[in-house]
Regions:
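Structural signal for hydrophobic/aromatic residues that build the beta-strand cores
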Residues: 33, 46, 118, 135-140, ...
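ATP/NTP phosphate-donor binding region
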Residues: 2-196, 203, 207-210, 250
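Catalytic phosphate-donor-binding core of small-molecule kinases
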Residues: 251, 255-258, 262, 275-288, ...
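Active-site beta-loop-alpha substructure in enzyme catalytic cores
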Residues: 350-389
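Generic C-terminus detector
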Residues: 115-116, 422-476
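Catalytic core of DAGKc-family lipid kinases
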Residues: 150, 162, 172-174, 187, ...
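Conserved beta-strand elements of beta-rich interaction domains across eukaryotes
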Residues: 53, 85-87, 142-144, 174-175, ...
């Protein structure tokens, strides 16, 4: 059998190929197993001829990296568990859009020995792709329409099982539970953490990892994002970057494949309180100071003596909200400092201020179309005072990112940012709101209810970026 395998094997530069006669749907055909042996390339493919009544109907193929979850061998049969892109059938227009579909392909070999050899070869090829073997899955049962557990059972779990990935699932029970989990989790047992949630839980996990004593190692743990909440901008941004359809299944497959990319982490603090990543205001006076990224130096005005920053000393909290001075452990925030001459400013009034490090804020809102996962910048979007008709138009155009072309919108990339929220124009007794991924964390003194955990409205915020500090599972 080994001699036969060597005889059937063809080698070209960086490629190893083998052809066998197989049976598919009781029809004999030729199938070719091709592996890439070139350094830096991933996987291989299985290609076979399709025939009907002895007539050729073309070829089909499965790419082990892009299309296959796993392989199973029983007797003379090889089952390839695929999650491949197929064309939808349109009722009125023939072929429709493409979508990923879960499908099994069974190939019957001539002998059990050949089935075992091919099965082992395919399995080793998939193994070489660097996919995760052990995952810790955090499910938020409260986010969005409270569908997290259902999404996990119907869309996530079947794909993980088909891929042969072991996992432990835990549901969050209260706010900041995911942060506590990440803070205390034995990371040596896992190859990644997957979150079935909105963006808020992902932020909690990042904060938990960064509060650990071993944060430098902990933050390298790859994070997977599966949409299951209200704000799913991170998952939408990842899938949109490779033109994949937005779905929990596609996000899960991105984790299964094991591709990774770096993610910028923004340190946002106010006095001794850790803060936010995204926030929005109504029409308010306020002050924004920033260090523009390369190519955006013409935005704003240079800071003069009257506009110098009068913010407080920046101290981060420990894992659960206690400031710790010299005894504090964990990530201390970005250490990058900027010369005073680099800072510029823009004063209000503003209708809205958005700060993003990914393009999408949710599945249908794209405030920052030029945002990148790891460019060391934050994308700053400022909506200035404008007529209500213009504001309505902006709310519609923000769905595709075209709002940034409006003369009432200022859009730029910054390396650092300082924000001092102001009071509402025409009514200085009314303040605005500050939120992080949909969670309210600060609002004006006029609020009927004031949570003691909220930040102080009106006190300046400072935000800086650590480029590529965290790691994400990504589609490609």
């Amino acid at each position: 059998m080994e001699a036969q395998s060597k005889k059937d094997m063809r080698r070209t530069t960086g490629v190893q190929s083998q052809t066998e006669t197989v049976s598919i749907n009781n029809s004999l055909t030729k199938a070719s197993l091709t592996l890439s042996t070139e350094s830096g390339r991933r996987g291989g493919e299985l290609r076979w001829h399709i025939s009907n009544d002895g007539k050729s109907k073309g070829e089909r193929s499965l790419d082990f990296d892009r299309d296959v979850l796993g392989v199973e061998v029983k007797d003379k049969r090889i089952k390839l568990k695929a999650f491949e892109v197929l064309q939808k059938e349109s009722l009125f227009f023939g072929k429709g859009e493409k979508e990923r579909v879960r499908k099994d392909y069974v190939f019957e070999m001539e002998t059990e020995e050949k089935a075992t050899l091919w099965g082992r070869t395919i399995s080793e090829c998939i193994e070489s792709l660097g996919r995760p073997k052990e995952l810790f899955v955090i499910v938020n049962p409260f986010g969005g329409k409270r569908c997290g557990p259902k999404i996990f059972e119907k869309e996530v779990k079947p794909l993980l099982e088909a891929a042969g990935i072991n996992f432990k699932m835990q549901e969050t029970r209260y706010g900041m539970h995911a942060k506590e989990i990440a803070y205390s989790l034995d990371l040596s047992k896992y190859d990644g953490i997957a979150c079935v949630s909105g963006d808020g839980v992902v932020v909690e996990v990042v904060n938990g990892l960064l509060k650990r004593e071993d944060w430098k190692q902990a933050i390298t743990m790859p994070l997977g994002i599966i949409p299951g909440g209200t704000g799913n901008g991170m998952a939408k941004s990842l899938l949109h970057s490779v033109r994949e359809e937005y779905s929990a299944s596609n996000a899960t497959f991105a984790i299964v494949r094991g591709c990774k990319c770096p993610l910028d982490v923004a340190s946002v603090v106010q006095g001794d309180k850790s803060l936010l990543r995204i926030f929005g205001l109504r029409k308010y006076d306020g002050k924004i100071q920033f260090v523009p990224a390369l190519g955006y130096e013409e935005f704003g005005e240079p800071i003069g003596e009257s506009n110098k920053w009068k913010g407080e000393t920046v101290i981060l909290q420990d894992a659960f909200g206690n400031s710790g001075g010299s005894e504090m452990h964990g990530y201390k925030g970005s250490s990058t400092e900027f010369e005073e001459s680099k800072w510029r400013f823009i004063n209000g009034p503003f209708v809205t201020v958005w700060i993003q490090n990914v393009p999408w804020a949710s599945k249908d809102i794209m405030p920052a179309p030029q945002a990148k996962f790891s460019d060391g910048c934050l994308d700053l979007v400022i909506v200035k005072d404008c007529p209500k008709t213009v504001l309505l138009s902006l709310l519609l155009s923000i769905r595709d990112g075209s709002h940034v072309y409006s003369p009432f919108v200022t859009y730029l990339k910054v390396k650092a940012l300082k924000l001092e929220p102001g009071q509402r124009v025409g009514d200085p007794t009314m303040g605005g709101i500050v939120d992080m991924d949909g969670e309210l964390i600060a609002r004006g003194d006029d609020a009927i209810h004031h949570d003691p955990n909220w930040m102080d409205y009106g006190t300046p915020f400072l935000m800086k970026v650590d480029e590529g500090l965290a790691t994400l599972f990504c589609p490609n």
